[in-house]
Structure formats: C-alpha cells, structure tokens
Amino acid sequence: MSHGPNLTTFDEGRLMQVLVAPIVSEKATMIAEKSNAVTFKVLQDATKYEIKAAVQLMFKVEVKGVSVVNTKGKTKRFGKSVGRRDNIRKAYVTLKPGQELNLGGEAA
C-alpha cells in the first residue's frame, strides 16, 4: 500500500537537486545509530514524497519514512552590521530494517 505519488511521476533532474547535503553532527549520528535514520539538508520547497524518491534513486535503498523539520536562521552580528543565517529544512530519512546507507569513509 503506497501512499502519495509514485517514483516514476517525479522529474529525475529535480530529484537530483532535492538533497542539498548530508548533515553530520553529534545529534544526527546518535539518531542514525538508534533508529537507522539519515539526516539531510534539503531544498526549502521539497516535499516528503520528493525526498523519499530522491534517496531511493540516488542511494538505492528502501525508505520507511521521512520526517521534516524547518529551522529558522539565527540573527548574527558582525560588529555593527546585523546579518542573518539562512533558514534550513532538514529531513530525517528512516530506512527499512536491513538497509544501510554509508555517507562517508570511516575515520581510523
């Protein structure tokens, strides 16, 4: 029982741009070990269905689910001038049992 659009309904060029970068942090690593989930920075207008299709297309793994978090950019000061960091949309992609996704080489 599949919900939402099928993998074939998406433009492959768009799917290649949906995933901006993997997020490798202490929190993301803990989540990956505990719940077999991988964290990505994604486009602001990316949908859960697009993210799922992009991960399946690029990494050839089966995705169980996708959770998305929008993080507002912080206001930062540089001397007298005020700047602002970009808003970030994070996707926590949970993989099906038995699936594994290695984003980088293991440090020795």
Curated annotation (Swiss-Prot):
<dbReference type="InterPro" id="IPR013025">
    <property type="entry name" value="Ribosomal_uL23-like"/>
</dbReference>
<dbReference type="InterPro" id="IPR012677">
    <property type="entry name" value="Nucleotide-bd_a/b_plait_sf"/>
</dbReference>
<dbReference type="InterPro" id="IPR012678">
    <property type="entry name" value="Ribosomal_uL23/eL15/eS24_sf"/>
</dbReference>
<dbReference type="Pfam" id="PF00276">
    <property type="entry name" value="Ribosomal_L23"/>
</dbReference>
<comment type="subunit">
    <text>Part of the 50S ribosomal subunit. Contacts protein L29, and trigger factor when it is bound to the ribosome.</text>
</comment>
<keyword id="KW-0689">Ribosomal protein</keyword>
<comment type="similarity">
    <text>Belongs to the universal ribosomal protein uL23 family.</text>
</comment>
<dbReference type="GO" id="GO:1990904">
    <property type="term" value="C:ribonucleoprotein complex"/>
</dbReference>
<dbReference type="GO" id="GO:0006412">
    <property type="term" value="P:translation"/>
</dbReference>
<dbReference type="GO" id="GO:0003735">
    <property type="term" value="F:structural constituent of ribosome"/>
</dbReference>
<dbReference type="GO" id="GO:0019843">
    <property type="term" value="F:rRNA binding"/>
</dbReference>
<comment type="function">
    <text>One of the early assembly proteins it binds 23S rRNA. One of the proteins that surrounds the polypeptide exit tunnel on the outside of the ribosome. Forms the main docking site for trigger factor binding to the ribosome.</text>
</comment>
<keyword id="KW-0694">RNA-binding</keyword>
<keyword id="KW-0687">Ribonucleoprotein</keyword>
<dbReference type="GO" id="GO:0005840">
    <property type="term" value="C:ribosome"/>
</dbReference>
<keyword id="KW-0699">rRNA-binding</keyword>
<protein>
    <recommendedName>
        <fullName>Large ribosomal subunit protein uL23</fullName>
    </recommendedName>
</protein>
